[in-house]
């Protein structure tokens, strides 16, 4: 019974997040760029590290993606909200991976009957940054 409740609660949470309007994002030092169905909120370089913050499509459960890149290597990816275990897994798996390889592996992944997913949104953001 507990497993059913947890699965039902997770399904409700993801469905509710899917049906919500996109989260409004605050302006940062760099201009907000709207591309496709996601927004690049900030894109800054400090001490050789490129810091990117993006809000993914309202079609996915996550609400923010934070990316750190040095050269062409992804150093860190952190998702806010969404499926926590999967988001941590994505970040751990692509740490140290080249941007091109991450795009190749994540591009086009869907989530259920949705046309996109959290990994696909990351690949779209990375494509835009190239």
Label every model-predicted segment.
Residues 17-20:
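Boundary of Sec targeting at the N-terminus
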Residues 4-13:
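Sec-dependent N-terminal signal peptides
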Residues 56-130:
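Active-site- and interface-proximal helix/loop "cap" or "latch" segments in soluble metabolic
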Residues 24-70:
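Structured beta-strand/loop patches that form or line metal/cofactor-binding pockets in enzymes
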Residues 12-14, 53, 75:
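A general, composition-driven signal for non-globular sequence regions
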